[in-house]
Amino acid sequence: MAVILLLALALVLGCYCALHRHKLADIYLRPLLKNTLLEDFYHAELIQPEAPKRRRRGIWDIPGPKRIPFLGTKWIFLLFFRRYKMTKLHEVYADLNRQYGDIVLEVMPSNVPIVHLYNRDDLEKVLKYPSKYPFRPPTEIIVMYRQSRPDRYASVGIVNEQGPMWQRLRSSLTSSITSPRVLQNFLPALNAVCDDFIELLRARRDPDTLVVPNFEELANLMGLEAVCTLMLGRRMGFLAIDTKQPQKISQLAAAVKQLFISQRDSYYGLGLWKYFPTKTYRDFARAEDLIYDVISEIIDHELEELKKSAACEDDEAAGLRSIFLNILELKDLDIRDKKSAIIDFIAAGIETLANTLLFVLSSVTGDPGAMPRILSEFCEYRDTNILQDALTNATYTKACIQESYRLRPTAFCLARILEEDMELSGYSLNAGTVVLCQNMIACHKDSNFQGAKQFTPERWIDPATENFTVNVDNASIVVPFGVGRRSCPGKRFVEMEVVLLLAKMVLAFDVSFVKPLETEFEFLLAPKTPLSLRLSDRVF
């Protein structure tokens, strides 16, 4: 009986040892040996159990929607599954963040993985990487189309080029448009653009309801006029009240919108356009052709006018043409690159400027205290131009615009290609991995900004100096125009023009939206259209 009990005890002890070797060592052996010299127990040493080696987690270990052969994770957008709408992709990515965490894997039908980053530390690590030539994934449909048209394009353009060629285009083509000194020369002309826009709004609103229907169409015309004033150096007359615009001009904004939608569908769809000309590809080609034809015609007309008036042009007119002339006079670039760059700048500026204005207006009209404070900063400029000093001192207005950028940037996420191996959120990613930095979603988190879903311009005002500042906690993830060398070259122009437009509209009208603004994804974030605004004349 005693033998059986001893065997049973040994069996229990053996099982316990097998399952909890480290507990046995810590609880039983260490107390027995702690006061005993090594030589007293035949130099025996306690053998530590080896910690199991942790497997290195790679890209395919990242959580995300289930992958299906030949579809990847794109099945979530297909009609017969219809979990999500592609027009609400910004909301889709927010939902994936809630489901899977701060790092999510998306897989293309070609089995190419794309990693979505939501963690602030990961975003900063990727976007602040010191690179001479930051790499971002090219928009393949643009690359494919432009390579098929060597008669028009010598390269795939500044946005889609990479490496030294990108650097060459960037440094040559953007030096003027990014210069604060050059942009200040345009302030009087841009004031005039804003004034004409205000008069056009007055002419187009319903006299009884004071509602301007299809406001976005007029905003696009304003964007076209403002960008052409900058790039070509003279007013084009697109905001004239009594002049009927040519049909091609009215089609231009629609073509720009279609261009972005086709890019979205080509990037997030199944990619069949790569193998035969699908509707997505045909729509893109038509839009690209129309944009090129219309703006190219404007440029050619300006070149002829320039030749005629070069001898008698005054200094002011020559100053306004500085950007246009600087690009045309570049000797080391193909004329096709010069022309396509001007076309790209104008096309991108139309929708970006109009959408940014609408997002800012939506934010400030939703805050009852915002409009009076903006008005107080510009009330002395009712009958005069708003020049640089006024822009510099517009603390609250700039804070409102910055807060709108945080909540609804037109570029809500930024794409990069990793240039070296990185560990992000505990996963090891190899160089060459495509990552999407989900900055807007990160900006909506209370862990990054207190009251993150609320419109709070005051967060961008230094309480000590009462000046506008971007030196606040986590401001580095608010990047509506990109960051670093790959940032949008039109950033300064858009910021200056939006301040002017907001000031002029608040001086002229009490603005309200007939219906709350909704957003859609069109490769950039855009307002859902049509939009109607109620504009009541402001009485002082």
Curated annotation (Swiss-Prot):
GO terms for cellular component: mitochondrial membrane; mitochondrion. Its main location: mitochondrion. Pathway: Steroid biosynthesis; ecdysteroid biosynthesis. Its cofactor is heme. One of its GO terms (molecular function) is ecdysone 20-monooxygenase activity. Pfam families: p450 (PF00067). It is found in: Mitochondrion membrane. It comes from the Eukaryota. It catalyses: ecdysone + AH2 + O2 = 20-hydroxyecdysone + A + H2O. Coiled coil: none annotated. GO terms for biological process: border follicle cell migration; central nervous system development; dorsal closure; ecdysteroid biosynthetic process; growth of a germarium-derived egg chamber; head involution; midgut development; pupation. Strong expression by embryonic stage 10 in epidermis, decreases significantly in older embryos. Third instar larvae show expression in the midgut copper cells, Malpighian tubules and fat body. In the adult ovaries, expression is seen in both nurse cells and centripetally migrating follicle cells. Keywords: Heme, Iron, Membrane, Metal-binding, Mitochondrion, Monooxygenase, Oxidoreductase, Transit peptide. Heme binds at C488. It is an enzyme of class 1 (oxidoreductase). Its EC number is 1.14.99.22. Required for CNS development; midline glial cells. Involved in the metabolism of insect hormones; responsible for all ecdysone 20-monooxygenase activity during embryonic, larval and adult stages. May be involved in the breakdown of synthetic insecticides. Belongs to the cytochrome P450 family. Member of the Halloween gene group. This is Ecdysone 20-monooxygenase.
